Regions:
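Intracellular eukaryotic protein kinase-like catalytic domain
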Residues: 1-145
Length: 145
């Protein structure tokens, strides 16, 4: 994650590896998107929601260019920096694709609510499954509007 430089991906500043381990990241003052949407629904217009969607789509395009799959695109993992800027965060499930077209997860809990059918059924993750999750994110976000 430290290698990512994109205006809509939260920046990793550093890691303190001595116990307790600390991850130092860029501050997104307005918190996670889910809570922000719920508390500001009456003040948000469609243009702002579309702007948020566009910003997140550029972050996903950037990740695809780096051969990464995020695997957890959800409102809880999008942070609001300012009233007009969102950033993708929480790369705990993300994986590099290397020379393969997909990543196969062998074990562990996954966020089924947002996942693509092939990810649920076969535990296969591609950039297309990230796009599916992005679509679910847009659906969630616009239903609050």
């Amino acid at each position: 994650m430290q290698q990512f430089e994109h205006p809509h991906i939260i920046r990793l500043i550093g890691v303190c590896s001595e116990s307790p381990i600390w991850i130092v990241m860029e501050l997104a003052r307005l918190g996670e998107m889910r809570a922000y949407l719920q508390s500001n629904a009456s003040r948000l217009d469609l243009a702002t929601l579309l702007l948020f969607s566009f910003q997140l789509s550029t972050a996903l395009s950037y990740l695809e260019s780096k051969k990464f799959v995020h695997r957890d695109i959800a409102a809880r993992n999008v942070l609001v920096s300012t009233p007009h800027v969102v950033k993708l965060a929480d790369f705990g499930l993300s994986r590099v694709l290397d020379n393969q077209s997909y990543y196969k997860s062998s074990k562990g809990k996954l966020p089924i609510k947002w996942m693509a059918p092939e990810s649920i059924n076969f535990r296969r993750f591609t950039t297309a499954s990230d796009v599916w999750m992005f679509g679910n994110f847009i659906f969630f976000k616009t239903n609050l509007y």
